[in-house]
Amino acid sequence: YTFLAFMAVASHTRCQFTAPGVVPAACTPPTRPNIQCDDKDEEEQLNIYYGKLHSRYTHHRTGTIKPRTSHYCHEVDAVVIKMDHYCPWVNNVVALFTQKYFLLFVFYTCLTCILCAITLGGRFLSCYRANARSKYSGWNTSQKKAEWCSPDKTDTVVTICNVVEALIFGIFTIAMGCDQAEAIAENTNYIDRLQKKRGEQQTLLQSMQDVWGEPFGWRWFFPLAPTKEHRVTFQRFCKETWVQLAMFEPRVKRAFLHDVQ
């Protein structure tokens, strides 16, 4: 129990104080090109298309680029990559760099609740059987067993509160774990699912490696900082978005115009 509780607290602490993956304020879109064409209709269409492109990959409040799977969070007033939701339990955003710690926090909290329920349930069952034997068979329980099965009022109240908390938080963490498992399996965060969007198709193992930031190993079960893979993913998302905006140049305008039509 002590180990599980320690791991839950450690995971919660790492999740609370880890930067979730905020797009830096300096990561602004490239300067908008001055589009001039002989054909006014073509120029107007290009400006409209670039406006849509700019609104898709930049955020109007922060002025920064907005990579795919990223969303604006009012709590931190920034664009966060692979944002799932803001969790008041950890006072942080569950996103690219914090989802691993959030999942570990939920996992170890759930195990702690299950262990509490099993331990207290076992105590109740053991005492029930002992009292039944003593009542119907004349079998005398030991003094230690009798004291354990006849708690005082304080012990009774604490036990009842423990059982209630274990059931409530156990059910809550199981539900949260199922929701996160669905998000990982579909490679789609919570906000994107609300917007009817779907992430890239990939295997479950690939999705889990994206969340944990490294291939499967013993480090998955501990709130340790992942390898460089998470940082590479963060930089790749930002670079892809910047390139999408920077590639809009006169030399490729006809290709974009063809896409618009």
Predicted regions and their residues:
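Membrane-associated feature with strongest affinity for ZDHHC
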Residues: 1-261
